A protein has these predicted regions:
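Nucleic-acid substrate recognition interfaces
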Residues: 1-159
Length: 159
């Protein structure tokens, strides 16, 4: 069973910048996948699966124009592409309206983090990929401070 706990974070300026970079990459991947699906549909092609789009996304990710994407965790863009495909499928099933492109101004900045790769302490939380090397990722400066202490139960207190 996975339990969700909503917590408030207090990131420093470097961490805040990194979070906005993650959200921007997520928005970029979502918009790219949606544009690719629309383009394919207009040409008379069928639905492209999220696995196919993720394979296609590696080309722009490794190009010089989008080199900034290499600093972002792969899981962030992967989940954004999955979300775009799900929204597109739901439209054709008649469950939702046509998916809109994500705007920097209108959309709420958000990104995906794999729940297995998040680490918690009593006072801090560490996200996946906040630094470029494993050694730097273990340092305390990469841990984001929690606003409420003791809100997340320790492994000892979980039964």
């Amino acid at each position: 069973m996975v339990k969700a706990i909503k917590v408030m974070l207090i990131p420093n300026n470097v961490q805040k910048t990194k979070m906005f970079q993650y959200a921007g990459a997520s928005r970029f991947a979502y918009n790219w996948a949606l544009a690719r699906e629309i383009e394919n549909y207009e040409k008379g092609g069928g639905f492209i699966s999220d696995a196919g789009l993720r394979k296609e996304f590696t080309k722009p990710r490794h190009s010089d124009e989008y080199a900034w994407l290499l600093n972002i965790s792969n899981n962030v863009t992967k989940q954004a592409i999955k979300d775009a495909c799900t929204a597109y499928k739901n439209f054709f099933r008649g469950l939702q309206k046509f998916p809109r492109f994500k705007s920097k101004k209108r959309s709420m900045p958000k990104f995906y983090q794999d729940n297995v790769k998040i680490r918690f302490s009593n006072t801090h939380v560490k996200f996946e990929g906040f630094s470029s090397s494993r050694k730097a990722n273990k340092q305390k400066m990469n841990w984001v401070k929690l606003a409420e202490h003791g809100r997340i139960p320790d492994r000892k207190s979980v039964v």
